[in-house]
From Swiss-Prot:
Positions with biased composition (Basic residues): 333-350
Major localisation: cytoplasm
Protein name: DNA replication regulator SLD2
Coiled coil regions in record: none
């Protein structure tokens, strides 16, 4: 039974729609395998479709080409090569030259005409002297400006400057024949070679460096322990809490806020006694010896009695004299207020 591709496709689509309406999902390979009829239809459809593809030749769709003069667009190209703005034949001061092909054709035509003219008519002696070289020379000469001509004449120049845009043809031909760069030949070595690096045998291994690091860490720990042991413990209350480690706090130096005063220690009883004058004591001893020599009685008190009298007598206490007036100037000194004629260095507030 010969069937068309469209007929096979129609049967397959009808069955698929019926399957979707029944099961609410498209058919899978597992659903097609048990159905031999549908399996054959799928195979037949694939065979017919492959035959159609082979029969129809593939035609590439090409855009029609337009025969137009070459124009440099936003991405300028010339002879199939990308051209930069510095390589384009664009110059505001010069007009484009005539192409070389037209010049060569003009030269050949003029040569042929001159030869025919020489054969047909006997030209004058001046015309006979003119040859091919004279014709070429006359063509390449710069045209002279006439009164009616308004455009600028372009001289025929064979050599161009290094930055001239008219060197495009030369640069393109050079680029087309570039070769891959080759390594240069071995250059002769310099006469003086650098001095070799000295080997340092004193360099340490990783194991030695790690061992030194551990030693440094242990030394730092020992110093920290010594510093902690030197901290003076603060005593609270009676001397019972001296051994507690919790009371050990490092002493902090208090910041000096006021005027420095000398520390006054409590004087002992021995220091509070009046010191004896040596000169007076010597005079007493001399007078006592003289009286003993003369046989006179000494009615003066002894040294022990004098010491007892001195101890019994209380020392005079110095009393502060009351100030006469509570002057306002005291506030200047106490509060360090600025005065008119004082030195600004002293008595400043901190």
């Amino acid at each position: 039974m010969d069937m068309d591709v469209q007929q096979v496709k129609l049967k397959i689509k009808r069955w698929e729609h019926a399957f979707i309406a029944e099961h609410n999902r498209p058919p899978d390979k597992d659903d097609i395998r048990p159905l031999t009829e549908m399996k054959q239809l799928y195979k037949l459809y694939s065979v017919l479709k492959s035959k159609e593809r082979k029969a129809e030749p593939i035609q590439k769709q090409q855009t029609p080409r337009k025969d137009s003069n070459m124009v440099l667009g936003p991405t300028p190209q010339i002879y199939g090569k990308a051209v930069s703005i510095f390589e384009m034949k664009v110059s505001p001061l010069k007009v484009e030259e005539t192409p070389t092909t037209e010049v060569e054709e003009d030269i050949e035509s003029e040569i042929e005409s001159s030869v025919n003219r020489r054969n047909s008519d006997e030209a004058s002696a001046n015309e006979e002297k003119l040859g091919i070289h004279s014709v070429k020379k006359r063509l390449f000469e710069s045209p002279k400006k006439t009164e009616n001509t308004t455009h600028l004449a372009v001289p025929q120049v064979t050599r161009y400057g290094p930055n001239s845009p008219l060197k495009l043809a030369q640069t393109v031909s050079i680029r087309q024949h570039l070769l891959t760069p080759k390594k240069k030949k071995a250059e002769p070595k310099s006469l003086y070679t650098p001095s070799p690096l000295l080997k340092r045998n004193s360099s340490k291994t990783l194991y030695e460096l790690a061992h030194e690091h551990l030693q440094y860490v242990e030394e730092i720990k020992e110093l920290d322990q010594q510093f902690k042991s030197e901290i003076v413990p603060i005593r609270h209350g009676n001397g019972q809490d001296i051994g507690d480690e919790s009371d050990e706090v490092p002493e902090k130096k208090k910041r000096r806020t006021g005027v420095l005063r000398r520390l006054q220690f409590d004087e002992d009883e021995n220091d509070r006694t009046i010191k004896k004058d040596l000169h007076k004591e010597l005079l007493k001893l001399k007078s006592r010896k003289v009286k003993e020599f003369l046989g006179k009685e000494d009615n003066e008190p002894s040294e022990e009695e004098e010491e007892e009298q001195q101890k019994s007598e209380p020392l005079p206490v110095k009393k502060k004299k009351p100030k006469k007036y509570n002057l306002v100037s005291n506030n200047f000194r106490r509060l360090k207020l600025p005065k008119k004629n004082r030195n600004p260095r002293f008595g400043r507030r901190r």
